[in-house]
Amino acid sequence: MQDRPLMSARDIHAFGIEIVYKQLEKDSWAIESADVDADIKSEPQMIARKDDELAFFVIRTGMHPGRGRFEEGQEAFERLVHHAQQHGASCYFASVGLANSDGTTDDEMSVPEKGVAFNIVFDGLVKMELPANTANGNAPAAVS
């Protein structure tokens, strides 16, 4: 591996958003907005429409061996789902994993170098939902 500049956490996040953006376009979603600087605890990173469905997309990106995880907690999860519901939208989670393709070991594959190719892991979308009995705010959230 060469000594190249590294991607920042924001660069990695933006790359994950770009990956999901391109996939949604392939799947016939019309992207209405994409915002790498959206507050991850309260705002979606992308809003899109397909047929009659408006959807908010929460996107997280991680470097090998990990993947993007929702780590903001239950309160943020519920806030994001409620925010989508208030706008008549569905809410989806997209987890993206990146591995430096120049790497041959786990350590090398975890280095987010600029200007290299990456192996991408994206298994699709997971709908973020709250159980029907969350009116009292005590029920746990569900990802289906």
What is each model feature region?
Residues M1, G66-H82, V126-P140:
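Hydrophobic transmembrane alpha-helix bundles
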Residues S110-S144:
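Glycine-rich, aromatic-bearing surface loops/beta-hairpins
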Residues E43-A48:
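Short acidic loop-to-beta-strand element that houses the catalytic metal-binding Asp/Glu
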Residues V36-I40:
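A short beta-turn/loop motif at secondary-structure boundaries
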Residues I17, S42, G73-F77:
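Amphipathic coiled-coil/heptad-repeat helices and related helical stalk/stem segments
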Residues M1-D35:
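Acidic-basic catalytic patches of nuclease active cores, encompassing PD-(D/E)XK
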Residues R49, E53-E113:
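Catalytic cores of nucleic-acid endonucleases
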